Amino acid sequence: MPWRELDEPTDDDKRELDLQYRGKVQFLVDENAGIEVAKILQGSGYNAKFVADLGLRGRCDEDLFAAAWKDRRVIVTHDADFLDNNRFPPHRNPGVVVVRPGSDGRDNGGLVRCLAKAVLLAGKNATWFQGKKLDFSSDEALTITSQGGRHRYLWRKHGMPLIWED
């Protein structure tokens, strides 16, 4: 099936979501995303830590994932290894946002745009991210994988995002 436009949420929908998800999202920014991304998030009012802030610089992905789970922080990274459910199981997933880098290998502008889209979807609510892996492709299309299945979205410059229907 083709892309179709999502329905605009009603005010009641927004209020209900706000009541369900009261905790503010906190981020853990991976080394490959860079300290600049952590600073941008902090400057936007988010609780964001860079791996070095937690003594995790140079540590393996499993250590980073465990620390994020313990502190309930959403991992922000360019590293698609975090999408592997065998290494990083969904039931112990604090939330992962993977932004595939552009052709230059590092695209923090794209990362920040994609994070803004993720927060637009979730509000500022930490609970929404738990158990989800958000995978932004280099064209900023989004695939969300969770125990509830897999959903694909495509943002446009104006209007609601499109959702892919199988």
For every predicted segment, state its role.
Residues 1-28, 33-47, 62-66, 103-166:
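Feature 3881 marks metal-assisted phosphotransfer/nuclease machinery
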Residues 31, 78-80, 101:
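Short secondary-structure boundary segments
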Residues 55-56, 63-66, 70, 83:
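Amphipathic, hydrophobic secondary-structure cores in small proteins
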